[in-house]
């Protein structure tokens, strides 16, 4: 699928990725045009001639971003296509991808931070995910922190996603929940996400939520936040905690 503009200055392209057990799930690459006119690419996907040309028509690629320790399979191809771009990745990815030269490690500060606020999700060392809030469009970009898979993906994968709680709504799968090693740290990180201004959710896996995304994200994260004492600046975040 080619690039599709979802709002001013933001484009997405979907591809299908095969995982373990033969499961195939949709994945999304997001391209953001910065105020400089340069491009910032989140979770690069397959980069054939046609897609590289489409991206080139939008502007010069300045940054390639691998947002966690699993979203890197197509990074070398993107580097080959856009050799002048800086590569920024989740902490620890440089050990998994010694074939890629990294310009920086994702954290709370970034050269694009005025437009795309990075928020590291602590307490999940298996993923080391960093999510981003695109301030101009009010969009939250996530990789594996949240899914929104609603389309049928075949009997096996749909059944698996239902069993792991990652199907039919904005949700965190049980696989990700099991990856939490420091619950207070993870909860504090997710609360920082909820304190940011966003209305749209752009996940790597699943449907985009165009409006009202914050409420959906609150519901998905409520299991993690239920015991957290919220700071005064977060009192406006009303998290509904379900009985479990």
Residue ranges with predicted function:
Residues 42-45, 65-69, 89-91, 121, ...:
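Short His-Asn-centered micro-motif
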Residues 3-50, 130-134, 138-143:
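Conserved beta-strand hairpin/beta-sheet module of binuclear metal-dependent hydrolase folds
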Residues 225-244:
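A short, highly charged, low-complexity intrinsically disordered segment
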Residues 48-49, 70-74, 94-97, 148-150, ...:
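Active-site environment of divalent metal-dependent phosphoester hydrolases
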Residues 2, 7-8, 40-41, 88-129, 135, 181, 185-188, ...:
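Metallo-beta-lactamase
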Residues 53-112, 222:
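Active-site HxH/HxHxD metal-binding segment of metal-dependent hydrolases
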Residues 17-22, 39-45, 63-67, 116-122, ...:
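Short, flexible loop segments at the rims of nucleotide/cofactor-binding pockets, characterized by
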């Amino acid at each position: 699928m080619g690039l599709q503009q979802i709002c001013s200055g933001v484009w997405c392209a979907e591809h299908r990725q095969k995982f373990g057990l033969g499961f195939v799930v949709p994945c999304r690459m997001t391209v953001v045009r910065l105020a400089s006119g340069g491009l910032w690419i989140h979770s690069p996907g397959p980069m054939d001639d046609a897609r590289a040309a489409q991206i080139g028509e939008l502007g010069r690629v300045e940054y390639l971003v691998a947002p966690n320790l699993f979203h890197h399979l197509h990074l070398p191809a993107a580097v080959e296509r856009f050799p002048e771009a800086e590569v920024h990745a989740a902490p620890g990815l440089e050990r998994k991808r010694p074939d890629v030269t990294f310009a920086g490690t994702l954290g709370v500060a970034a050269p694009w931070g005025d437009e795309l606020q990075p928020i590291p999700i602590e307490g999940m060392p298996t993923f080391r995910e960093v999510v981003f809030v695109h301030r101009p469009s009010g969009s939250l970009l996530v990789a594996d922190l949240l899914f929104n898979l609603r389309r049928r993906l075949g009997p096996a994968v749909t059944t698996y996603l239902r069993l792991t709680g990652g199907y039919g709504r904005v949700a965190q799968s049980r696989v990700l929940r099991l990856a939490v090693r420091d619950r207070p740290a993870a909860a504090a990180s997710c609360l920082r996400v909820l304190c940011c201004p966003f209305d749209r959710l752009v996940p790597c896996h699943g449907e985009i939520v165009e409006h009202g995304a914050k409420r959906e994200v609150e519901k998905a994260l409520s299991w993690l936040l239920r015991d957290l004492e919220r700071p005064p600046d977060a009192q406006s975040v009303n998290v509904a905690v379900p009985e479990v």
